[in-house]
Amino acid sequence: MRIMIQESSDPGLEVLERGRRALVRGAWEEAVDSLRAAAEESPADATAWELLGTAHMWRQETDSAIEARQQAYALYRDRGDDLSSARVALELAEAFFEARGEAAVANGWLQRARRLLEELPPSGEHALLKVWDCYMVLMGEGDPATAEAHAAEGVAIARKSEARDVGILALALQGLSQVGQGRAHEGLDLLDEAAAAAMGGEVTDPQWFYLTCCCMIDACDQVRDYERSMEWCHRLREFCDRWQVQAFRTACRIKYTGALLWRGEWVQCEEELERAVAELRRDRPSAVTGALVRLAELRRRQGRLDRAEELLEEARGHPMTSQVRAELALDRDDPASAAEIAEALLRRLPESARTERVAALEILVRAQTELKQVEEARTGASELTSIADQVNTPALRAASLVVRGLTAGAALKHEEAKDLLEDAVHLFEDANARFAAARARLDVARSLAALGRDSAALSETRTALRLLEEMGAEAEAERARRLLDRVESGTAGSEQAPAVRTNKPRRGPLTRRQREVLALVAEGLSDREIAARLYLSEHTVHRHMANLMSRLEVNSRSAAVARGVREGLI
């Protein structure tokens, strides 16, 4: 992170000004060339080195950026310029933390900046330090209450020192911190204000615009307002196209997959995540873990549990791995382990981190109801309901209805459970949450079966199964098939615990995408040609072929085509 840089000690240098103008235009290569020449021509000019470091950062040339910034820092220190030295120390903290993932080194530079600023009057650099304090508390400790206090200080200092850019980002972080505490409407109002100011031209540094939009998207994700999140992702993509910064593009791609996962658009989600992982492995290996965790969650939902586990091992240390591991335990019919992981996660999350606690509470209540721990489940359901009532978005209200319904079912109050779960389905559908809606339908079907209403239970189960198979949600689809078997055999009402998983899944119809692939195979196209025709990766086509052949119980492409023709699939 950085703020506008003061004028050079020798502004008459034409080459330096050419580099400065190139930075403003986003002409990164020209900026690097001009600023390198300026630094070589005037090696004692700290501003030239500082600007060169900025240009290298835009081009993701981290080592060169750090080298240039360290040179600038030394020159500013030599001339006794504590304010500029502190600014560059903050820029070095950014490089080490964001690009290299070296938190300890980054903290060293933050503390150096803090000491340099201690005796100086309030400035934009002081405001930027408070922004960093807020960011580090949110990222490292997950404590939105403390983060809000830092952000509010940053807003106040920026206003006094007329540091408009950093003040807008501080305002966005204050809003994000409020959302994290469950004060969603208050926080989103601040985020709307910050975003409007950024789009209205009050932000001159493109990085501030980008980070302000990221705060908005993160807040939307926390309250599960993914329609709003998608709108901001599209705006952020336009920004990335304008400024041609690969790191921003990749980060935007990952944020976008949150909405795709929620909406059940998993083919596109998979392509975006695989591309993001490849880009991060190449350009910023230290930042790849977040994308790996999200890909692990997708693989889990697809029923590829072993692959999900492998990805989580690779992403070890990322704070979100515990949540996916708990879900994996549920997929493997191990609610005791799921509950243990979820409880540990909740112990680590502060009470103030209300929206961050929701996912762990959902897992915990589902696990406890499977274990028949009704009183414990009521406690978790009560906390989640309190959060949902405070945040008051449709998706969180639906999550509250689900845990209340599961708890009612575990207490054998099946009519109450059915009503709560049916209301959840409607809310999820209104929020375009295809996967969550289908999963809740299965819960409705279990309640109907427990009430002896087998015909309605069959209808709900078949609808859920169709939706899950269309998405490629194999883990939940297999649960639906097992439930369908039990309802059809008349044993579902007496079986409250999940049935033991069989090694061989029940064969179901092909998804829409699998039928498209099979039709192109019938035309004689290769996987590479199919990928080009459908705008997919070749790897994704391979996966579709493997899945459809497994579903059709055949071992060759020709046999798949023959069966597809026979069964009217193509």
Regions inferred by a protein language model and the residue ranges of each:
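Residue signature of alpha-solenoid helical repeat architecture, marking inter-repeat boundaries
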Residues: 9, 43, 79, 83, ...
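Amphipathic alpha-helical segments of tetratricopeptide repeats
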Residues: 32-40, 73-81, 94, 111-118, ...
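Alpha-helical segment of the N-proximal tetratricopeptide repeat
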Residues: 11-37
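Helix-turn-helix DNA-binding segment
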Residues: 410, 419, 443, 485, ...
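Residues within the DNA-recognition helix of helix-turn-helix
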Residues: 272, 460, 544-547
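Tandem amphipathic alpha-helical repeat scaffolds
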Residues: 18-24, 47-60, 86-102, 125-143, ...
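Linker/hinge segments immediately adjacent to helix-turn-helix/homeobox DNA-binding domains
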Residues: 394, 406, 420, 449-512, ...
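Single-residue signature of alpha-solenoid repeat helices
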Residues: 31, 65, 105-106, 147, ...
